[in-house]
């Protein structure tokens, strides 16, 4: 019997901030930024390769996102839920985070809780970062939205986009709030050749 234990990347980041360390390390005091880079460029890439292979065959899916309150469903039921999601409109679970340029527009208009600071980011359509809530009746499973991309890439992307980007969702939908905040940071994205040779990523990022 194969039980695949999973967790959302946002929850991993929150645990980094609480002092928890990376996979199979004991570096609790490592700066949060360094933990994130290790996860983003190494651990999550390794894990995604394993996930892609196991997704069609595991017997049970274990959601460990809610600490101390795991949820488990049969693998067949989980895959059926992903199939249904791919065939209809769906909404990802958004998350909001403060930053150096953060403002107050999102806090006011989205009725966000007071955090003693600001809100700079809204991630609301990034399968690599956001999650989905799947209702199985007896339990609700929170699962990385990236799993849907891996399970049904052509249904989500179409043949042409899938041929170019493979099992990756090439668009990031997020909102940056600077209202009554600071100037937005200068962002520099490398050329495709550079990001491929230095970071082993398939494509670079353009912004609009």
Give, region by region, the residue ranges found by the protein language model.
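Short linear interaction motifs
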Residues: 1, 44, 167-169
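A residue-identity detector for tryptophan
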Residues: 10, 23, 44-46, 101, ...
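Conserved phosphate-donor/acceptor-positioning beta-strand/loop module used by diverse small-molecule
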Residues: 2-20, 24-28
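Transition-metal
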Residues: 58-63, 67-207
């Amino acid at each position: 019997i194969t039980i695949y234990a999973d967790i959302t990347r946002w929850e991993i980041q929150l645990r980094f901030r609480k002092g928890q360390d990376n996979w199979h390390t004991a570096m609790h005091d490592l700066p949060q930024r360094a933990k994130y880079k290790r996860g983003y460029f190494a651990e999550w890439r390794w894990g995604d390769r394993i996930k892609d292979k196991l997704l069609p065959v595991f017997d049970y899916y274990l959601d460990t996102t809610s600490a101390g309150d795991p949820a488990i469903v049969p693998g067949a039921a989980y895959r059926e839920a992903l199939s249904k999601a791919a065939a209809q409109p769906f909404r990802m679970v958004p998350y909001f985070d403060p930053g150096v340029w953060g403002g107050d527009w999102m806090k006011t208009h989205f009725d966000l809780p007071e955090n003693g600071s600001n809100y700079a980011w809204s991630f609301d359509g990034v399968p690599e970062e956001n999650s989905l809530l799947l209702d199985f009746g007896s339990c609700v499973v929170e699962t990385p939205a990236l799993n849907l991309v891996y399970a049904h890439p052509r249904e989500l992307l179409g043949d042409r986009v899938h041929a170019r980007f493979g099992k990756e969702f090439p668009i990031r939908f997020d909102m940056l709030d600077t209202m009554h905040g600071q100037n937005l940071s200068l962002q520099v994205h490398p050329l495709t050749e550079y990001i491929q040779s230095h970071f082993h990523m398939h494509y670079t990022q353009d912004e609009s």
